[in-house]
């Protein structure tokens, strides 16, 4: 049987305990365990480790709120740590007659483990290392495995969890030989921790909501997330050491393959050229989503691909026909008030969740085809009007992506121009050798840039601020164009070259 979906939690207690603090720690631990029953109601167990290295355990087939009512005192003045587990037993793995050994946390001779997830290769580990476990539940293989091959170090635990164990996990480990230590680890299962200043104790659980509700900052405690694919060692001497569980080929910076979501415009083209200059292997990903400017954008991105000598992947999609309701999709008029100024300052041409949809599809392709990064042309200028250009969206999505891709399939989002406004993007594009003369920015279908929509307005000003005449043509009176560009120098394209190694 598999471990299934559970909630785990516990506490590591710092300093000497008196009766009052022990009671308060227990009250907090019980409230966390009861809240965590949301993620598991088929059994409940708790293991308490004393400062002298002795275990006490209490296990019950009932859910935590019922089981805890009948359990004796858990935390006393000699307690060092405790771990618990609320198990949600999958329908296909129902065990009608559970023994205490079938209820987590799992105990060995020295090691106690509470685990949320599935160990897919438990039988293989059992055979390979000649292990004897006390239950057929997959998690039961972990205590004997650690007792047999773990040297007790953080690095040793990292190696076992990264290279030996196959499956999903958020787990906590106690060792009776070292009662002042706690190890927490997670790949793509959630795990949060909270430092309780008043109680001088570190609590942890499968959700931040179980640790602390909504409180004013001055009334609350620090709550953090254990980052996916991380293992930490925590000591009552205030040791906090962490190590990555990403395999070597998934470590950041080891491989540099980037898939750039490319519209054919200034921002994504500059992003691609900047990455090329930094030594990335780059490919362009373009979506033909039945928008008004589809034809000129498609022509532009194809020419950009040729000019930069990089692959282009095109995806044809009809999805946004269902969403509709945007001038970019042919419904309504493109805003050209005040030569595009108004369109540059407000999202009149918003396409529902467009960037979010593109990001999801790009991440799927990146995972499938071995790209480490998806790069976007989001930028600070357009974030003022379009929420999906905000850097915070990318930052938050990066935190969520380990839960969206397969095990050890790391894909991260990059925003090479995310911190720049439009004239800074043009300057970077000129420096990085982006073929800006091939780009298409206009919301309309041409054949020339209209010169009166929001993107045209920003583009023209951005080039002028840099003292360079925009190389694309605008559908504006020639005399007005000559007057606007007077005093600027001609645009010159210099293809990108990789930066020398060691340069900033």
Question: Each predicted region: which residue ranges?
Answer:
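Conserved short alpha-helical segments that host acidic/polar catalytic motifs at enzyme active sites
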Residues: 1-253
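Local cysteine-cluster metal-coordination motifs and their immediate loop/turn environment
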Residues: 7-8, 43, 356, 360, ...
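Conserved residues at the C-terminal ends of beta-strands
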Residues: 12, 377, 459
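Predominant activation on well-ordered alpha-helical scaffold segments within soluble catalytic domains
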Residues: 30, 140-143, 205, 302, ...
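ATP-dependent adenylation/nucleotidyltransferase module used to activate substrates
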Residues: 254-432
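Short, charged low-complexity linear segments at domain edges
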Residues: 417-443, 481-482, 487-488
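Iron-sulfur (Fe-S) cluster-binding segments and ferredoxin-like electron-carrier domains
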Residues: 448, 454-476, 481
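Long, charge-rich boundary regions
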Residues: 476-504
